[in-house]
């Protein structure tokens, strides 16, 4: 019977563990500002959804989805603070940095799904355009714009700030950059404002508000309700185009790929490591992105037998640590050159295979220090046998070795005449011509037909 625990601790549910971690984050004063903005975001989102229903404007609904995306960005910021508080565990030896990447990926994908929903609703509205009420359309636009800009500029969101700079530019940023260059050519003083790469979130907030203002004016002047649907499609396309590069970048990080902009630097460092003193070969190198701005990697280094392991390890780590923050280096020492062994077809003039033995070699290392599997000194830091280099495998052909020890003819294994006269063409296997001596190969189980025959006229021992 197993051990009976009288006072077993109750297992917490998923929501209980989530509440415990939320309390851990809420105890930090840095998260109070984020929680305050989150509460304001929920209030503004509730009012905006009511105004979307009263105005019947799908363009305002598409712009409200950007406010919901701001809520996701605040949650991502809380996750970032939680990752900073948590330490690596045995189950997660690399830490919890990938949760930031997962939060960014989920937020951008949800924003793109919202944009696709707006496109689907807009396609239905083109068939039957409803009437749009402009009572709270302009008010909702300025409320959403003010809150979005205030949130993006007040909260330092490290994950999204890194992704917005590292990901490729969206088509909206490229078009705005072209317009900025043309404008700065006319007014050079604006180059410090428009020429740097604009924040994609601020850019889409301003572009969406501009589209809603045009919608309001056209509906008020000409009662042109179809412009609301056109503005919704424009906002959805801008949202999708802005979020897509970020989702692609964060998805590649989740797939543990190597960033393209560091591949050349890593190749240069690997070549430098291969030229270090004592290093014979660098193999099985693998580098991937662990989190935003942090690389992890592993590499196997084969060194000379007389090289200092600690010195080589220090030099390799010093070279690669400039790019790879989490590095695993496995050091292997080169094997001694083994003596050449006879393998393959046997010459016809070899008559007695029992006169072969293993060539005696002087001991190179003590038997206590060697590993019989790999012929490598056994030490606590040595690799397992399956990782040793140039280790004979199980596919080695049988080996016949010289042996000076003589064996008597006929060991009582008389099973009749041996059927291999076609192999030895010198008459050794034919009765009456000569004695056929026993064979000893690298195999331990000798078939019964490889027996011995008696000499003619010689009594058996």
UniProtKB/Swiss-Prot annotation:
Q: What's its membrane topology?
A: Multi-pass membrane protein
**Which parts of the sequence lie on the Extracellular side of the lipid bilayer?**
55-64, 120-134, 222-223
Subcellular location, principal: Golgi
Regions that span the bilayer? 34-54, 65-85, 99-119, 135-155, 201-221, 224-244
The biological process GO terms on file are: regulation of zinc ion transport; zinc ion import into Golgi lumen; zinc ion transport
* MF terms in GO: zinc ion transmembrane transporter activity
Residue ranges the record marks as coiled coil: none
User: What residue ranges lie in the Cytoplasmic compartment?
Assistant: 1-33, 86-98, 156-200, 245-461
What Pfam families does this protein map onto? Cation_efflux
**Biased composition, class Low complexity, residue ranges:** 370-379
Positions of the UniProt region annotated as Disordered:
362-393
Listed under GO cellular component are: Golgi apparatus; trans-Golgi network membrane
- Any idea which UniProt keywords this protein has? Golgi apparatus, Ion transport, Membrane, Transmembrane, Transmembrane helix, Transport, Zinc, Zinc transport
- List locations, semicolon-separated: Golgi apparatus, trans-Golgi network membrane
UniProt xrefs under InterPro entries? Cation_efflux, Cation_efflux_TMD_sf, CDF_SLC30A
Q: Subunit details for this protein?
A: Heterodimer with SLC30A5; form a functional zinc ion transmembrane transporter.
Q: What does this protein do?
A: Has probably no intrinsic transporter activity but together with SLC30A5 forms a functional zinc ion:proton antiporter heterodimer, mediating zinc entry into the lumen of organelles along the secretory pathway. As part of that zinc ion:proton antiporter, contributes to zinc ion homeostasis within the early secretory pathway and regulates the activation and folding of enzymes like alkaline phosphatases and enzymes involved in phosphatidylinositol glycan anchor biosynthesis.
Q: What family is it from? A: Belongs to the cation diffusion facilitator (CDF) transporter (TC 2.A.4) family. SLC30A subfamily.
Its recorded name reads Zinc transporter 6
Q: What organism does the UniProt record list as the source?
A: Bos taurus (Bovine)
């Amino acid at each position: 019977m197993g051990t009976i625990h009288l006072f077993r601790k109750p297992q917490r549910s998923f929501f209980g563990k989530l509440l415990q971690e939320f309390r851990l984050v809420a105890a930090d004063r840095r998260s109070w500002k984020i929680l305050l903005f989150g509460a304001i975001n929920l209030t503004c989102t509730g009012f905006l959804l009511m105004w979307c229903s009263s105005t019947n404007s799908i363009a305002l609904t598409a712009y409200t989805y950007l406010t919901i995306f701001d809520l996701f960005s605040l949650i991502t910021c809380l996750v970032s603070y939680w990752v900073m508080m948590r330490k690596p565990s045995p189950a997660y030896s690399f830490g919890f940095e990938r949760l930031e990447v997962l939060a960014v990926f989920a937020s951008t994908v949800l924003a793109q799904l919202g944009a696709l929903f707006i496109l689907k609703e807009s396609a239905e509205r083109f068939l039957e355009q409803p009437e749009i009420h402009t009572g709270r359309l302009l008010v909702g636009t300025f409320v959403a714009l003010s809150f979005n800009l205030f949130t993006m500029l007040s909260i330092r969101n490290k994950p999204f700030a890194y992704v917005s700079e590292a990901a490729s530019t969206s088509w909206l940023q490229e078009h705005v950059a072209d317009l900025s260059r043309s404008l700065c050519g006319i007014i050079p003083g604006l180059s410090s404002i428009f020429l740097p790469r604009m924040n994609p979130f601020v850019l889409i907030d301003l572009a969406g508000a501009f589209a809603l203002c045009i919608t309001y004016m056209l509906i008020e002047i000409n009662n042109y309700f179809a412009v609301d649907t056109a503005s919704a499609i424009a906002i959805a396309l801008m949202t999708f185009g802005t979020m897509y590069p970020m989702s692609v970048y964060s998805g590649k990080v989740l797939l543990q790929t190597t960033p393209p902009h560091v591949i050349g630097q890593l190749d240069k460092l690997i070549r430098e490591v291969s030229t270090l003193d004592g290093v014979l070969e660098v193999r099985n190198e693998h580098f991937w992105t662990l989190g935003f701005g942090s690389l992890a990697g592993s590499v196997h280094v084969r060194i000379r037998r007389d090289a200092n392991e600690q010195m080589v390890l220090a030099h390799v780590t010093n070279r690669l640590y400039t790019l790879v923050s989490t590095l695993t280096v496995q050091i292997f020492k080169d094997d001694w050159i083994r003596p050449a062994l006879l393998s393959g077809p046997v010459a016809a003039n070899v008559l007695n295979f029992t006169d072969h033995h293993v060539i005696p070699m002087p001991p190179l290392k003590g038997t206590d220090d060697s590993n019989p599997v790999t012929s490598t000194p056994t030490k606590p830091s040595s690799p397992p046998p399956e990782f040793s280099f140039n280790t004979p495998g199980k596919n080695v052909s049988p080996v016949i070795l010289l042996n000076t020890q003589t064996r008597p003819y006929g060991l009582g294994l008389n099973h009749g005449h041996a059927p291999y006269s076609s192999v030895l063409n010198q008459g050794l296997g034919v009765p009456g011509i000569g004695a056929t001596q026993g064979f000893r190969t690298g195999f331990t189980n000798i078939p019964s037909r490889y027996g011995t025959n008696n000499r003619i006229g010689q009594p058996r021992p």
